[in-house]
Structure formats: structure tokens, C-alpha cells
């Protein structure tokens, strides 16, 4: 029987242990996609307590707490920070089998150094007090934690109208050597059917100093804002494609669609597809020209619980997996980009694991141009960001493509404690390759496989995103 969370956690073969401890463990972190608030990095935020750093804004934990019968006031409501922490501590013993149980205790170990204790009502007081004592120290500020975890680069997620003043302040601070770069997330300019689209167009007009009445005007405004992002080091875009659509339209049709929407009319399903396709084709051309990487996060079904959405808003744990067809519209979208000689480096993530093989084979259709791994099947995302999901994604990537060219893990998180997910990923990667060796499916060549692991953990991403550190 193995002990829980030892130094060899998940490393069930000798070869896996060698790979992890000699090649993976000490690799820096290149966190190319996250949702950390850049203002907290700029001001080197000091966390008030363990709730502030660990529970605030964490929809993974809120879902588990609700499932455990915890009242909403103890999740997102007006309960005190300590009450919310205790409610989480009471939930943790019930999360065995859920990645939250592993993440919780990995996060206590790093960076807090709390080992040999499982979070529960019996230990919540001690862990609350010890964590709060550490949070008062310099190494546990926002920047301090990033430095402790050996982070070299983070890519935040930013709206085109953002002034990026926090990124500018971080870049100007010579005392901080971690790259914090913006990522372009233009969903609000893309989702023409959304209730707030017209208001957003007005805000985009102001940010770009451009009047928007025709489709070409929208492109000019977006281009100006991309110039602004590029000036602050942006090399990456990200799109939430909850449903992948494709529809062709000429500029006259696009002008009419936009004009009707700006006049307060809802677009038809066909018009939505035409507008979204046109925006993506325009943007992909700009990404290609600017040598940016584009990311598509595909397949979320958001805000399912209308009552709770009306009470507490979006992004608070009421999203799930969608099951819309994506193979044909995605193929047509990427093909159209290729026909324009404007297909940039692209990472595709799917939320529905049913679509793993669709994505795994789709990226192979558009590789080439002398660029290794140009098209990427992205790491297990959101509900797949757990042991089973990571194993499935990497297994299918290996079977359908080249695992050795994989750009690896990202936190996709709002929490400064989520860097242990890179450790979790690395252990699972080494476990998988170690088992291949044990089963005679891969050679016991530590130099060959060690270099592969090292590349997946850090080097591939740094090379792919072409960001100097």
C-alpha cells in the first residue's frame, strides 16, 4: 500500500521516478494562459488570509461545496472569510476521488510547506492560523509566490479595450524578472448575439477612437487595439468558441448584419454564423501577420442555472460541457484561414472529451510550413484538468500526433496557488511514460525520454510562443 502524497506521488515505476526527479521536477513554469488579475501582480498584492488566496473566486471549490450541501452564503455570499474557510474544510474530506483533494494538499505543501496534515474540521484552525502567518511574510505576496514556484512567464487574459496599465507597470519594474504579458481575448466583439454587444461597441469605439457603423470599421478598431496590445508584448490570442460555426458572407451582407444589430435587432442563426466567421477570419489574418498564437477553447455550456445567474452572476460554477457538433465547421474555418495563407500557430482545446479524437486528427490536417507542432491539441481543459483527463488527452495526442512536440500544461486559473497543477501534470506525464517503458512500449532510454519530458514541461512552450525571457 502506498502512502498518500509522498515525494513519489503518482510515480509508480522506477523509470517514472527518474524522469520526474531528474528531468521534470525542477523545470521552470511557462504559464502561457491564465486568468490572474494583473493588478495584483503590479501592486504585489498581500493576501488578507487563507480565504482570500485560496477560496475567493474559485468556482471549482464552490461546485464541490454546493454538492456537499453548503449554503450559498458560505460560497459566494455574505458569510465571514473564516466561516467560508471552515465550510471548505468540512467539504474537503468528501472530495476524495476528485482532483480537488489532490490539488488542496499539493497547494498546502507548496508553497506553504504544510505536510502530514489533511484539511478537515479537525485541522482547519491550525491550517488557518499557520497559513495566515505565512501570508504576512514577503515570500507569500503575489510576486513572492510566483518566484517561489519558479515561474518565468504568465499570459493573462485581457479584453481589447483594456488600457494594459498594469502590464506596463510590471514591465517597467526592474526588480521583478517574471514576464507578465497580455493575451488578446476579443469575445465581446465577436458575440454579436450577446445582450451587451451594442454597449461594448460603444466602449470599443472610445478605446480605439474609431466610429463603428460598418464591418470594416470594426476591423479598423480591432486592429488599433491589437497594435496597443503588441506594444505591450502580446503574442497570444484566445477565443471562447462555445459553439463552432461557419458561414460565408460578402462585405455588404456583413455591413447589413452589423447595422441591424446596432439598431437593436437580434441577428438570425445564419447571421450570427456569418458575422462570427468573418471576425475570426479577419483576426486570424492579423495573428498570422503579427506572428501571434491563436487559441480556441471549444465547447462550454455556460450559465445553465438562470436563477443563480440572476442572483450572483456569471463564472461562479454553473457551467458544464456542451455537445454540439464541431468537426465540419471547425474544418471549414481552419481551411478558410489556410486558403488565405493566414493560418497562424493554433492551439485547440475541447471541453467535451468525446471530441478528443476530432481535435487530435484535425490538427494533423493543417500542420506544415516547416514548423514543428504548428497546430496543437491543447492540454486537458477545465473539467478535463484532472488525472484521467490529462492521461486521455496525452494518450490520444501521442497516438494521433507527436507528444514530443506538445507545449504542455497551463493553469487557466485565477489563483496564485494553482502552479502546483504544473507539478500534477508533470507527475502524470512521467507516470504515463514510465508505464510505457515498464510495458516494453518505449525504450528504457533515459536521455531520450528525459529530453522529451523536459521539452514538454518548458522548452517546447518557450520556443513555440517565441517569448524571450
Curated annotation (Swiss-Prot):
SUPFAM superfamilies: Metallo-dependent hydrolases
EC number: 5.3.1.12
Organism per entry: Yersinia pestis
Catalytic activity: D-glucuronate = D-fructuronate; aldehydo-D-galacturonate = keto-D-tagaturonate
Coiled coil segments of this chain: none
Pathway recorded for this protein: Carbohydrate metabolism; pentose and glucuronate interconversion
GO molecular function: glucuronate isomerase activity
Main enzyme class: isomerase
Name of the protein this chain belongs to: Uronate isomerase
Keywords, ordered alphabetically: Isomerase
Phylogenetic classification of the source organism: Bacteria, Pseudomonadati, Pseudomonadota, Gammaproteobacteria, Enterobacterales
Domain of life: Bacteria
Similarity comment: family membership: Belongs to the metallo-dependent hydrolases superfamily. Uronate isomerase family.
Any GO BP annotation: D-galacturonate catabolic process
InterPro entries documented for this protein: Metal_Hydrolase, Uronate_isomerase
Database matches in PANTHER family: URONATE ISOMERASE
Amino acid at each position: 500500500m502506498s502512502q498518500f502524497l509522498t515525494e513519489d506521488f503518482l510515480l509508480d515505476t522506477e523509470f517514472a521516478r527518474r524522469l520526474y526527479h531528474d528531468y521534470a521536477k525542477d523545470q521552470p513554469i511557462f504559464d502561457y494562459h491564465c486568468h490572474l488579475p494583473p493588478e495584483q501582480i503590479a501592486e504585489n498584492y498581500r493576501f488578507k488570509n487563507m480565504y482570500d488566496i485560496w477560496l475567493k473566486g474559485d468556482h471549482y471549490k464552490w461546485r464541490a461545496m454546493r454538492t456537499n450541501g453548503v449554503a450559498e452564503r458560505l460560497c459566494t455570499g455574505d458569510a465571514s472569510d473564516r466561516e467560508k474557510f471552515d465550510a471548505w474544510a468540512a467539504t474537503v474530506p468528501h472530495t476524495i476521488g476528485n482532483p480537488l483533494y489532490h490539488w488542496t494538499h499539493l497547494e498546502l505543501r507548496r508553497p506553504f510547506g504544510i505536510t502530514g496534515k489533511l484539511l478537515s474540521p479537525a485541522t482547519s484552525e491550525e491550517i488557518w492560523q499557520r497559513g495566515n502567518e505565512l501570508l504576512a511574510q514577503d515570500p507569500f505576496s503575489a510576486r513572492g509566490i510566483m518566484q517561489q514556484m519558479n515561474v518565468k512567464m504568465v499570459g493573462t487574459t485581457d479584453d481589447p479595450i483594456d488600457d494594459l496599465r498594469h502590464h506596463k507597470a510590471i514591465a517597467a519594474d526592474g526588480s521583478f524578472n517574471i514576464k507578465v504579458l497580455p493575451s488578446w481575448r476579443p469575445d465581446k466583439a465577436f458575440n454579436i448575439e450577446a445582450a451587451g454587444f451594442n454597449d461594448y461597441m460603444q466602449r470599443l469605439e472610445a478605446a480605439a477612437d474609431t466610429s463603428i457603423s460598418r464591418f470594416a470599421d470594426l476591423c479598423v478598431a480591432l486592429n488599433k487595439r491589437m497594435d496597443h496590445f503588441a506594444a505591450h508584448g502580446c503574442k497570444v490570442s484566445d477565443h471562447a468558441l462555445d459553439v463552432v460555426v461557419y458561414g460565408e458572407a460578402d462585405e455588404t451582407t456583413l455591413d447589413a448584419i452589423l447595422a441591424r444589430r446596432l439598431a437593436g435587432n437580434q441577428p438570425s442563426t445564419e447571421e450570427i454564423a456569418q458575422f462570427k466567421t468573418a471576425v475570426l477570419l479577419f483576426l486570424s489574418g492579423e495573428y498570422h501577420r503579427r506572428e501571434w498564437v491563436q487559441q480556441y477553447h471549444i465547447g462550454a455550456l455556460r450559465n445553465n442555472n438562470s436563477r443563480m445567474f440572476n442572483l450572483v452572476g456569471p463564472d461562479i460554477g454553473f457551467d458544464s460541457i456542451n455537445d454540439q457538433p464541431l468537426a465540419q465547421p471547425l474544418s471549414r474555418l481552419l481551411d478558410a484561414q489556410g486558403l488565405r495563407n493566414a493560418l497562424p500557430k493554433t492551439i485547440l482545446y475541447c471541453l467535451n472529451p468525446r471530441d478528443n479524437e476530432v481535435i487530435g486528427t484535425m490538427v494533423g490536417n493543417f500542420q506544415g510550413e516547416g514548423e514543428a507542432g504548428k497546430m496543437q491539441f491543447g492540454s486537458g481543459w477545465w473539467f478535463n484538468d484532472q488525472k484521467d483527463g490529462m492521461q486521455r488527452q496525452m494518450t490520444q495526442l501521442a497516438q494521433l500526433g507527436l507528444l514530443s512536440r506538445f507545449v504542455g500544461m497551463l493553469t487557466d486559473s485565477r489563483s496564485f496557488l494553482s502552479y502546483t497543477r504544473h507539478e500534477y501534470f508533470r507527475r502524470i506525464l512521467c507516470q504515463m511514460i514510465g508505464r510505457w517503458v515498464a510495458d516494453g512500449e518505449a525504450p528504457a532510454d533515459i536521455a531520450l525520454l528525459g529530453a522529451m519530458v523536459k521539452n514538454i514541461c518548458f522548452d517546447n512552450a518557450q520556443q513555440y510562443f517565441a517569448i524571450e525571457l
